[in-house]
Amino acid sequence: MNEVVQTPAIQPLPKSAPTAGKQNLLDLDRAGLEKFFVEVLGEKKFRAHQVMKWIHHRYVTEFDEMTDLGKVLRAKLQEHAEVLVPNIVFDKPSADGTHKWLLAMGVDGKNAIETVYIPDKTRGTLCVSSQVGCGLNCTFCSTATQGFNRNLTTAEIIGQVWIAARHLGNVPHQMRRLTNVVMMGMGEPLMNFDNVVRAMSVMRDDLGYGLANKRVTLSTSGLVPQIDRLSTESDVSLAVSLHAPNDALRETLVPLNKKYPIAELMASCARYLRANKRRESVTFEYTLMKGINDKPEHARELARLMRQFDNAVQAKDSGKVNLIPFNPFPGTRYERSEEAHIRAFQKILLDSNVLTMVRRTRGDDIDAACGQLKGQVMDRTRRQAEFNKTLQAGKGSDAAA
């Protein structure tokens, strides 16, 4: 008979105020946690494994609640360590099951990132952020309008998975609700390489979230040297934000293309696949914008690019295309392609034997396009703060939050 594991009752999240001299255990993968237990606590490695399970399987952050640890070890942990997760600023479910969290990074409340859970019939995908803002300035991206602040720590990245899994009641050995993680949220993951790779290690560890390599996907705008480094240090699925079939157009949409043009980018993707035979394909993301990159000639050019990629890898279907209807946000000059143009674009690719999917928009009612909720909530927070200052200064009450 299978053991029945009770989902822990949802308790209020602890404050994310770090304590000087204490190690946040969420910042460590298995190897780092083992080293901490041996070198700092003077304990055996298996004790690190016990604590890792308490944190990631049972969502326990208080050492006193880790009941299979002795009092002496718990006292050591209280002295030298802590488990801090991000604070939830805003928790917004959608009518279609999509769920979005706005999470505060740090104790000052000035930085926030977004995490989105997208359920489907056979899987549940979590979209995770890697930076506060982004510095690549892609012209069609809402996050780019907010600028770049800083990289997220490993704890802040894996903390997003912890919060979502805790919310979903994702207890190991029961029905899995969180089946995939995509590093497609705010930021460029490869510009925060070490922290992202460490967090993805926890996602794929059986003591963490036990996801298969192919179920963790890193999406990049095309940092060629980091793609090459990733091929030797991690074994996750790779997605590339392409969005244009030629350099002239891509440079206007993704300025990084001026440094790493399409030919160099495609060559690095081919090297990524050839480095490990278990890697079957790279997904190329293509956001369709009305009158910009959705014309038939763009589709034919993209089909040629995919055929060239197959030849470089020497394997059929090495490149898959994911067509993404543009999700408008306030102030953008771009528009979503019409449905007829999207279908015509896809047909040209399919007729050219290119594996092509159209990503259906989810969570429109909660602004699930990355960067939108942060902009709305943080703007309201700013206006509320200004309103409060006005009242405190006795300047009247004609301001509005």
UniProtKB/Swiss-Prot annotation:
Active site per database record: E114 (proton acceptor), C370 (s-methylcysteine intermediate)
Record-linked InterPro entries: Aldolase_TIM (IPR013785), Methyltransferase_A (IPR040072), RlmN_N (IPR048641), RNA_MTrfase_RlmN (IPR027492), rRNA_lsu_MTrfase_RlmN/Cfr (IPR004383), rSAM (IPR007197)
Keyword S-adenosyl-L-methionine: yes
Binding site for S-adenosyl-L-methionine: G187, E188, S219, S241, L242, H243, N327
PANTHER family referenced in this protein's UniProt entry, alphabetically: 23S RRNA METHYLTRANSFERASE, RADICAL SAM CORE DOMAIN-CONTAINING PROTEIN
Family of this protein: Belongs to the radical SAM superfamily. RlmN family.
Entries under NCBIfam families matching the protein: rRNA_mod_RlmN
Species per Swiss-Prot/TrEMBL record: Stenotrophomonas maltophilia (strain R551-3)
A GO term, aspect molecular function: rRNA binding
General remark: Reaction proceeds by a ping-pong mechanism involving intermediate methylation of a conserved cysteine residue.
Entry's Gene Ontology BP terms: rRNA base methylation; tRNA methylation
Gene3D superfamilies xrefs: 1.10.150.530, Aldolase class I
Designated name of the protein: Dual-specificity RNA methyltransferase RlmN
Domain of life: Bacteria
